[in-house]
Structures are given as C-alpha cells and as structure tokens.
Design a protein with these regions (language model features):
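Charged, gly/pro-rich active-site loop segments
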Residues: 1-34, 105-168
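Structured helix-beta-strand junction loops
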Residues: 21, 48-49, 93-94
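Short, basic/aromatic recognition patches
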Residues: 24-52
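Amphipathic alpha-helical interface surfaces
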Residues: 42, 87-90, 124-128
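Short secondary-structure boundary/capping segments
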Residues: 43-44, 69, 89, 139-141
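Short beta-strand segments
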Residues: 49-83, 89, 97-101, 110-111
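Short, intrinsically disordered, mixed-charge
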Residues: 92-97, 130-133
Length: 168
C-alpha cells in the first residue's frame, strides 16, 4: 500500500460524500452503506493491475468505453497509456470520465470525475512505473511516449455483496 494517512482520510471522505449524494434508488439497490467498502477495504482490494471499463467523450459528445488495466495509487485510479492515444486526446479536450470495475454481480466500484495526464517528468511517474512493471512486467515508456491518466473522482461508490470478505 502506498497510501498515506491523509490519502486514506481523503478517500474515506469521498466514499462517505458519494453515499450521501447518491439518489434513493442507488442507495437502495446498492444497499448503502451496509454493502459499501471502506477506504481500507478498497485500497487492499485494488492492489496490482485491475481491469476497468473506462469511458471518455468524443468531440461530438459521443461516449467511448473500453476495457483497460488500471493502477490504484494514493487513493486514485491511474490508467497507463500513451500520449498519442485517442483517449488521451479526448481527455485533454474533455476531461470528464467514468470508470467501473466489477466482478460479476458481487462487486462494483464506480467512479465519475475528471482525468489529467501525468507525463514522465511528474513526481509520481517513477512510482507508477514501478507499480506498472511489477503488475504487468512492462512499462508505459516501452510503448513510446508513455503517460498515465489520473482520475480525480467526484463520485466513488462501491457495492460488495459480501463486504466481510474484504479485509481492511
């Protein structure tokens, strides 16, 4: 785990705010907060590379979604990619994104927010590269002009059918 105590507090506050702002139907269907994960449970679960459905928006306002690997570092999702990828260009112009990680009908992690590009000269880049290499054996720099997309979540909701199976 790379999260500081401040990261954990920020993440738990985001989770709590997201539950408070959720509509009645979502709170009911996700059985919030009883079946929600805590910051500690989420961080422990999201170790390594996790596949997410990552959604961006085209210049025409059309949604684009694709499965892609992600890293969870200091309480935020990061998407390894290259600067020339269509998703990177879309985010530069229109930073609103959504992502979802799920495991059948027993687990869902849903994020809405904005993404920014993290280039090689960013302070977090070396740590992200080490995580990426450990998780997948490759580096975004192996792909060309590698970058990471950092998702700053406005909303982060979780559902775990069996939350007790997720240690904190």
């Amino acid at each position: 785990m790379h999260e500081t105590p401040e990261d954990m507090e920020r993440l738990q506050a985001l989770l709590d705010r997201s539950i408070e702002r959720a509509g009645a139907f979502l709170r009911s269907s996700f059985e919030m907060p009883e079946r929600s994960l805590s910051a500690g449970q989420l961080v422990r679960y999201l170790q390594g590379n996790q596949t997410v459905a990552f959604a961006t928006v085209t210049a025409k306002g059309e949604p684009r979604v694709a499965p892609i690997g992600s890293l969870f570092f200091r309480g935020r999702f990061y998407i390894p990619t290259v600067a020339t990828a269509a998703r990177t260009r879309m985010i530069t112009a229109r930073p609103a994104v959504s992502l979802t990680h799920f495991a059948g009908i027993d687990l869902a992690i849903i994020v809405h927010g904005n993404a920014t590009t993290i280039p090689a000269d960013h302070a977090d880049f070396a740590s992200l590269e080490a995580m990426q290499r450990a998780a997948s054996g490759s580096s975004v720099q192996d792909w060309g002009e590698g970058v990471y997309l950092r998702v700053e979540a406005d909303t982060l909701v979780t559902f775990a059918r069996y939350p007790e199976q997720f240690p904190a």
